């Protein structure tokens, strides 16, 4: 059992180291994550990014360099690398954090960058977004700027399956700035409540009313049929029986 635990711990550590290496090297390419799959004949490495061409390189030169690094420095056997584009980069916290880092390196104003990115994430369909930029923003004293739009979950069960979080650091002349991005992806939380529109309520009432009228009509028809059967099967009175005997 101990050997099995060590195996999985070592495997997770290698994947974490590779993930950190790729995030540091390819943040300008909008690096979003990596998936490592072991096969009997080698290892398949799937890299997700906003701009795959920057990772592939000219004529696949960067891919060949990565394969050699994965094999010699991280111990992956026969790595086969595939680079895929992120389906919706505006809803990926890592991609958004890398965009903010690149814009800050170019000298953009941090508050404007945070507001523009928050608006862009909400336009992509997110329920909420929170962006925190901390460090020496304007003065020698460190402070932070927080931009929060929509509904953001920080605790609870919703965080596990709805919130995507990423942290990135960028080095500027004043010092190191920290970037934290939290995106609440479009999904229905457990406490979701939707108030129906008046038209929907009216339509629902009409539907219930028609169903009640049909049920009442069916009950009335069944009662009439049952009453007719009772009248047809009524027993003869004593006078009727005496008349039948005399006849």
UniProtKB/Swiss-Prot annotation:
Region Disordered, annotated ranges: 226-247
GO BP of this protein: translation
Domain KH type-2: 18-87
Keywords: Ribonucleoprotein, Ribosomal protein, RNA-binding, rRNA-binding
Gene Ontology molecular function: rRNA binding; structural constituent of ribosome
Similarity comment: Belongs to the universal ribosomal protein uS3 family.
NCBIfam families, per the entry: PRK04191.1, uS3_euk_arch
UniProt-listed PANTHER family: 30S/40S RIBOSOMAL PROTEIN S3, SMALL RIBOSOMAL SUBUNIT PROTEIN US3
Protein name: Small ribosomal subunit protein uS3
Organism per entry: Hyperthermus butylicus (strain DSM 5456 / JCM 9403 / PLM1-5)
């Amino acid at each position: 059992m101990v050997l099995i635990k060590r195996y999985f711990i070592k495997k997770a550590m290698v994947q974490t180291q590779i993930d950190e290496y790729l995030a540091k090297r390819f943040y300008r390419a909008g690096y979003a994550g990596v998936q490592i799959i072991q096969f009997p004949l080698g290892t398949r490495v799937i890299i997700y990014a906003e701009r795959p061409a920057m990772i592939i390189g000219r004529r696949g030169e960067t891919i060949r360099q990565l394969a050699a690094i994965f094999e010699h420095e991280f111990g992956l056997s026969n790595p086969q690398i595939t680079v895929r584009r992120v389906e919706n980069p505006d809803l990926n916290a890592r991609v958004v954090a890398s965009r903010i880092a690149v814009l800050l390196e170019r000298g953009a104003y941090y508050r404007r960058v945070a507001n523009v990115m928050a608006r862009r994430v909400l336009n992509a369909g997110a329920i909420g977004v929170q962006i925190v930029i901390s460090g020496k923003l304007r003065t020698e004293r460190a402070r932070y700027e927080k931009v929060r739009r929509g509904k953001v979950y920080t605790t609870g069960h919703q965080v596990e399956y709805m919130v995507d979080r990423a942290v990135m650091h960028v080095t500027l002349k004043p010092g190191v700035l920290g970037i934290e991005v939290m995106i609440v992806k479009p999904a229905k939380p457990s406490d979701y409540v939707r108030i129906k529109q008046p038209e929907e309520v009216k339509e629902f009432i009409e539907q219930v009313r028609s169903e009640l009228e049909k049920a009442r009509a069916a009950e009335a028809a069944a009662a009439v049929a049952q009453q007719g059967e009772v009248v047809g099967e009524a027993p003869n009175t004593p006078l009727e029986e005496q008349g039948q005997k005399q006849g």
